[in-house]
Amino acid sequence: MASIATSASTSLQARPRQLVIGAKQVKSFSYGSRSNLSFNLRQLPTRLTVYCAAKPETVDKVCAVVRKQLSLKEADEITAATKFAALGADSLDTVEIVMGLEEEFGIEMAEEKAQSIATVEQAAALIEELLLEKAK
């Protein structure tokens, strides 16, 4: 009997034998006898999905602060993956963004942590981490 180990959930069905892994990839095999084994692999197209650890509300507030600090128009798109540098922010602008975030959320960021922020998502995740610490 063939054995296949995967990290995704699997289900093995009776005749024709088919192994389904998740919803995006199907691997199947069939055999008439032990000596006649065939295996087919079909890769389905993948789509890029950006996942954000921070809450959407936090990301939205960070976007608003960034928009205000950099004097951006509403038409300028800012997402969780947006890098401050891509918006034209230099190191001084980043310091002003951090100060605006501290004021908006009522937190204080250590300089080492503040320097590691390069995207809206990183800022939002750090803010949520600091808010959790503050609540303790």
From Swiss-Prot:
Q: Where is the transit peptide?
A: 1-51
Cross-referenced InterPro entries: ACP, ACP-like_sf, ACP_chloroplastic, PKS_PP-bd, PP-bd_ACP, Ppantetheine_attach_site
Give the keywords, sorted: Chloroplast, Fatty acid biosynthesis, Fatty acid metabolism, Lipid biosynthesis, Lipid metabolism, Phosphopantetheine, Phosphoprotein, Plastid, Transit peptide
Residue positions, PTM O-(pantetheine 4'-phosphoryl)serine: S91
An example Gene Ontology molecular-function term = phosphopantetheine binding
Q: Which cysteines are joined by disulfide bonds?
A: none
Localization, UniProt: Plastid, Chloroplast
Domain named Carrier: residues: 56-131
Domain of life according to the entry = Eukaryota
Q: What is expression of this protein induced or repressed by?
A: By sucrose in the dark. Down-regulated by starvation.
Q: Pfam families, from UniProt?
A: PP-binding
Q: How is it modified after translation?
A: 4'-phosphopantetheine is transferred from CoA to a specific serine of apo-ACP by acpS. This modification is essential for activity because fatty acids are bound in thioester linkage to the sulfhydryl of the prosthetic group.
The Gene Ontology CC terms held by the record are: chloroplast; chloroplast stroma
Task: Please give the family membership noted in the entry.
Answer: Belongs to the acyl carrier protein (ACP) family.
Q: Output the PANTHER family linked to this UniProt entry.
A: ACYL CARRIER PROTEIN (PTHR46153), ACYL CARRIER PROTEIN 2, CHLOROPLASTIC-RELATED (PTHR46153:SF20)
Described purpose of this protein according to its UniProt entry: Carrier of the growing fatty acid chain in fatty acid biosynthesis.
Query: By what name is this protein known?
Result: Acyl carrier protein 3, chloroplastic
Q: What is the lineage of its organism?
A: Eukaryota, Viridiplantae, Streptophyta, Embryophyta, Tracheophyta
